[in-house]
């Protein structure tokens, strides 16, 4: 666990000492409303590469905006997908991509859904192939372990739920995290079935999900960090 914390600190130090970024493009749609709570119009970013093009994803109170950023001299919005829930009540959206699909969630609104967008033919076309609340209505964050085709939905129906993406357009629930010491998973980073969970006021956990392939299985706890100086709210992490 100490090694994990050291790595995170070193990564933070590296990025803090990196060269300053240069602004090459700015986009702001003034027709979009800000959230009622914080007046934030935009709420998330993601990126992916497909068909030799680079794309940026921006979440807003209106939905999902996809930009082709391949040519820095000609950046443009190539796709927009309206959210199932839109407007001033939206504070958070989140995204991850896998196997030619973009997965989109929202953390607010009774009408919110999981959206799956076929992005395999961008920048020419896209298609929303799934837009439903049958699996879950809301999630604060999602993360996809692309090496194992598993989607982790944080603060959704439970503290965290895991879905198989063996069929990328039809996720199947394979785990509901059942740990009485964890009431909320705020964010997650997962690599090769090792899940690093940021559990808010419940601290930090590391689980092994390699044997989790059905709803009856539970992951193995590898490490737990619940008390440390200036702990605060364990919000998010990355490796």
Please give the residue ranges for each predicted region.
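Bacterial Sec-dependent N-terminal signal peptides
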Residues: 1-21
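Feature marking well-ordered beta-strand scaffolds used for ligand recognition
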Residues: 18-239
